[in-house]
Amino acid sequence: MKNSADITVLGAGSYGTALAISLASNGHKTLLWGHDPVHMQTLAQDKCNQAFLPDIAFPDCLQIEADLAKALAASNNVLVVVPSHVFGTVLEQAKPLLRSDARIVWATKGLEPETGRLLQDVARDVLGEQYPLAVLSGPTFAKELAMGLPTAISVAGTCPQFTEDLVELLHSPKRLRVYANDDFTGLQLGGAVKNVIAIGAGMSDGIGFGANARTALITRGLVELTRLGEALGASTATFMGMAGLGDLVLTCTDNQSRNRRFGLALGKGCDVMTAQAEIGQVVEGYRNTKEVFTLAKRLGVEMPITEQIYQVLYQGKSPVDAAKELLGREKKSETPTQ
């Protein structure tokens, strides 16, 4: 079947829109679909996403499509950019409408709610084995990407040709550098764990602990990510790249990060509900914390920072008490995986 579009993007929030803008700016005909028909009609009329990325105009190659069937019929390349807790639901909706030659990539960062499973497992459960899968991950704030500011990400998947094609679609010498990676598991994991550590970094700054404490959290958070990755068979080298250290540093140090701002509010004394309301958008790290904690427990992986953040978010512990418990842990030697 011939493509009438080069790629279809499912998810018209800030990140999905930003990726669609970037793809269309490369000259690729891009369809953007979202679940809310009213929102999609507004996007089509305004030719920008005023709700999430105000005043960033859509390129001519970007087309809005409110009909999921039409969006999926237009291209065999499907980029899913929805919150992790609805990832499986969106795939279920898409499944009967997918083309036989469809190839699925996602930029969703997180794990399956309640189970802590990787999104590749969710995708396989829903879609079966017939479709090539891939993931995009790395240090990207939607606004900067949409504005065309220099950005770098990584892509990995189950099919080398699909990975190569995605690099060609996404890469732009002027705005976006894309690195191919062969660690499908590692790229998915990095995007989930960094959200958790960013909440911790925000809490630390909200309390007023300073740059030393924030840097320690980032560094030891990277150790926790690496431990968990090793338990799942991921490459440790991945976590020194865009989807590991890169995304971790970005999310922990800049207030464009919703997860960091959420943590800041908690550190300043807000309760969880109030802190979430202050952000006004999905805070992926809230659910990610429970998912990562569940996965670590199941695998027997020690993740003390993640555990303390889980206790703050779900068991009512104060951020100050969580910090005290981390500082009071038994002394140990520093090694790459401790």
UniProtKB/Swiss-Prot annotation:
Keywords of this entry: Cytoplasm, Lipid biosynthesis, Lipid metabolism, NAD, NADP, Nucleotide-binding, Oxidoreductase, Phospholipid biosynthesis, Phospholipid metabolism
Major localization class: cytoplasm
Keyword Nucleotide-binding tagged: yes
Amino-acid positions noted as binding NADPH in the UniProt annotation, renumbered to this chain: 14-15, 35, 109, 142, 258, 282, 284
Catalytic residue positions: 194
Annotated InterPro entries: 6-PGluconate_DH-like_C_sf, 6PGD_dom2, G3P_DH_NAD-dep, G3P_DH_NAD-dep_C, G3P_DH_NAD-dep_N, NAD(P)-bd_dom_sf
Location within or outside the cell: Cytoplasm
E.C. number: 1.1.1.94
UniProt: sn-glycerol 3-phosphate binding residues: 109, 138, 140, 194, 247, 257-259
Family annotation (Pfam families): NAD_Gly3P_dh_C (PF07479), NAD_Gly3P_dh_N (PF01210)
Catalytic activity: sn-glycerol 3-phosphate + NAD(+) = dihydroxyacetone phosphate + NADH + H(+); sn-glycerol 3-phosphate + NADP(+) = dihydroxyacetone phosphate + NADPH + H(+)
GO cellular component: cytosol
GO molecular function: glycerol-3-phosphate dehydrogenase [NAD(P)+] activity; NAD binding
Biological processes per GO annotation: carbohydrate metabolic process; glycerol-3-phosphate biosynthetic process; glycerol-3-phosphate catabolic process; glycerophospholipid biosynthetic process
Annotated pathway: Membrane lipid metabolism; glycerophospholipid metabolism
Family in the record: Belongs to the NAD-dependent glycerol-3-phosphate dehydrogenase family.
Task performed by this protein: Catalyzes the reduction of the glycolytic intermediate dihydroxyacetone phosphate (DHAP) to sn-glycerol 3-phosphate (G3P), the key precursor for phospholipid synthesis.
Record NCBIfam families: PRK00094.1-1, PRK00094.1-2, PRK00094.1-4
UniProt-recorded name of the protein: Glycerol-3-phosphate dehydrogenase [NAD(P)+]
Organism: Shewanella sp. (strain W3-18-1)
Gene designation per UniProt: gpsA
